[in-house]
Structure formats: structure tokens, C-alpha cells
Amino acid sequence: AMTTAAQDVAYSYTLTAIDSDVGDVLTLSAINKPSWLSFNAATGLLSGTPSNADVGSHAVTLRVTDTDGLTADQSFSITVTNSNDAPTIISTATMAAVQDAVYSYTFATTDVDVDDVLTLSAVTIPSWLSFNSATGLLSGTPSNADVGSHAVTLRVTDTDGLTAEQSFSITVTNVNDAPTISSMAMTTAAQDVAYSYTLTAIDSDVGDVLTLSAINKPSWLSFNAATGLLSGTPSNADVGSHAVTLRVTDTDGLTADQSFSITVTN
């Protein structure tokens, strides 16, 4: 009998028998065999392919029976040796993230080979993400600059160097950001001298339309909402301090205010 087999490799052994009695018909059968083997009674072929779960020793008993019911048994053990299997990934990647919100996904793996040590690594990740190779945690918080799609590849490597990779894309959706004012107010003016200051603003959200307005200003000043120009000439009656509040509003209604005082000297 063939008493050795290798995991994932086809095994075959043909039982043959003879009988000294001329004319006896011999019947072949398998009395005991593991489930991964099949036996062809017509040909005597015992065959099958063991899996990782079949690694170890398996008892087999084959029998030949003659016309008068006399039998001969062949009992033996087949030892299935292990072949290293690649690890497998058992977690489903989280492929959506939101700007300014914490993203996390735990990369989980397994290996059918008992005692294999698995090493986790990040092959490709965007800069806003970090990967903990001890726990498999991929985490981070994307900013407005990270809105869009980001390629990620995570890898698991077993003791013998076999690997499995999980490649996916994380799509970061935008959250509207308030605009910011980028200009510094002019806080002094002189009587009878033209005063001017241009409000400028920016928004990190591409495509946002910014609307400029004056919430509070003295009467001697005018504000051009199209250009952001605050201008005017104070008279003697305007000598003193004047409160001003200018505002920028984005497409979604978020605002930024600039409040300051203009001191008019005599």
C-alpha cells in the first residue's frame, strides 16, 4: 500500500488481488477509509486529494472477497504531510470616510496552518492614515485636502513567506468648511482723508461661492460687495471711534466675520 500523501496533492493506490482457485470471482471493497478518499470497486483504485484539514494519520482497510465468501484484508495507515497554505483575509474593508471624522478599519486575517505566525503590514496608504501592525488597525482623520479617492493595500505574510493582499480605495467625502478672512483690517483714518480697506476671504472648499457684506459700519463708509472695498472720507463730525463688522458667507451659509474699530483722528 501507498502509506504517505501530501496535502493538496492527488493520492492514488490500486488494490490488486489473486486467488489460486481457478474461476473464483473476486470482489473488492473498502471497509474503512477517510472521507477524502474514494474507492472504485471495479478497478481497485483508492484515490483522493487531502486538504489541510486532513493532515495527520488515517486508517484504511481494504478487502477482497472470493466467490465462497472467504476474505483477505489489507489494513494500513496513510500519513498526510502538511503543505504551507497562504493566509487569508477575513475582514471587509471600510471604503468610505468623511472629512474631519475619524476613520478606522481593523484588518483581520487567518491561516489554516496551525502555529503559523502572521505579520501584518501596510503596503500603500495615504499620509493621513496610520497602520498598527500589531493590531491591524488602520486609522486616521482626513482633512479637507484629503477629499477624494485614496488607494490602500494591506498585506499579511505567514511564517514561510506566503502572502495575501487586500487592495481597496477609500473615498473621503467633503464636509463644508466655513470661509476664512485673509486680510488685515485698516483701523485708523484721518479727517478729510480718503480711507480704504479691501476685505479678502478664502474657502478651502473648491467651487464655493463667497458673498461679501457689511453688517455694521458708520455712515461715512460705503462697502462694495463685489470687490470687498470699504471706503469713504470722514469729516470733522466723524472724529472718534467707529465699529465695523464685515462678513463673508459661503454657498452653504457658513460665515466668517471681521469686527474692528476705525479711529478717526482730528
What are these regions (language model features)?
Residues 1-27, 76, 85-119, 168, ...:
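Extracellular ectodomain surface segments
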Residues 37, 84-88, 129, 176-180, ...:
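Proline-centered linker/hinge motifs at extracellular inter-domain junctions
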Residues 41, 45-46, 123-128, 132-138, ...:
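Extracellular beta-sheet repeat scaffolds used for adhesion and glycan interaction
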Residues 45-55, 137-147, 229-239:
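Extracellular/luminal low-complexity segments enriched in Ser/Thr/Pro
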Residues 56-60, 148-152, 240-244:
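Exposed beta-strand face motif in extracellular beta-rich ectodomains
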Residues 64-66, 156-158, 248-250:
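Conserved structural position at the C-terminal beta-strand
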Residues 70-81, 162-173, 252-265:
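C-terminal edge beta-strand
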